[in-house]
From Swiss-Prot:
Family affiliation: Belongs to the glycosyl hydrolase 10 (cellulase F) family.
SS bonds (residue pairs): C284-C290
Keyword Cell wall biogenesis/degradation recorded: no
Domain GH10: 31-329
Coiled coil (residue ranges): none
Molecular function GO terms recorded: endo-1,4-beta-xylanase activity
Name the UniProt record assigns to this protein: Endo-1,4-beta-xylanase 2
Pfam families: Glyco_hydro_10
Organism whose genome encodes this protein: Pyricularia oryzae (strain 70-15 / ATCC MYA-4617 / FGSC 8958) (Rice blast fungus)
PANTHER family: ENDO-1,4-BETA-XYLANASE C (PTHR31490:SF76), GLYCOSYL HYDROLASE (PTHR31490)
Purpose: Endo-1,4-beta-xylanase involved in the hydrolysis of xylan, a major structural heterogeneous polysaccharide found in plant biomass representing the second most abundant polysaccharide in the biosphere, after cellulose. Accounts for approximately 70 percent of the endoxylanase activity in the culture filtrate.
SUPFAM superfamilies named in the record: (Trans)glycosidases
Pathway: Glycan degradation; xylan degradation
Gene field: XYL2
Gene Ontology biological process terms, A to Z: xylan catabolic process
Amino acid sequence: MKASSVLLGLAPLAALAAPTPEAELSARQAQQSIDALMKAKGKLYFGTATDQGLLNTGKNSAIIKADFGQVTPENSMKWQSLENTRGQYNWAPADALVNFAVSNNKSIRGHTLIWHSQLPGWVNNINDRNQLTTVIQNHVATVMGRWKGKIRAWDVVNEIFNEDGTMRQSVFSRVLGEDFVRIAFEAARKADPNAKLYINDYNLDSPNAAKLTKGMVAHVKKWLAAGVPIDGIGSQGHLQSGQGNGLAQAIKALADSGVKEVAVTELDIQGNNANDYAAVTKGCLAVPACVGITAWGVRDNDSWRPQGNPLLFDSNYNPKAAYNSVVQALK
């Protein structure tokens, strides 16, 4: 465990014991930190997604500092954002997020290294196996190497399964077959041996879904047996109202695949969602391998799907019933 991790582990206890300063409470408008409560239950964090622009908007920064213990960059670490033109890197937005997190003792989740979407055209146009292998290895080494030791976990591969559990068609699977998964994870382990390496996907929201059973769990078991260094599975958790209990059960099914960790990585729940947020929180608490939950944003109108009011804070940064349901689930 790094020294920063030790400090993170001690901070919530102090936060629970001491009264919250009035000025801080006004800035964040929540009575209790769900991150502090989560850590008091033995988990690592309750986090949120953000990026440079959001950190400079309204009360986002103050709320993240007070109520969340982990951050995931929503877009700034995706391949197209970092290297849309080959060899020309745009580091500034991602650097800003990392610097914010480090200076405020927040854990970081790197998102994401290998993904079929938001991918530069020059990568999509590669047809040679050896060339694509080298490009993957260099990308992973360069990106992870820039923040080595600062990022706790990485989504190494993202959204690689179809709904029936088969592998999604992409430049990676077309040119390399399933072997791109091994190539990416081995490169990631070499780039930062201490980082936790994840495979991440959506619609893993029912323990009986084919995408979970025939896709994620079956493949991860096979890859682990072959020595692929996968540490964890991330279930994104982009839910509709009423799906919270299904995801809670699915967390256990994912943990049973043999990975060391599971996490809910991009949680948002459309509709009347307080009961669902509570169910997901309790589901993570019930599974020892579940290390934490990340909400996919702070307030509703900054969400990628704002029409369903899916997050924990409303447009005025007031904590919603969903936030309070998480607080109650953690008591």
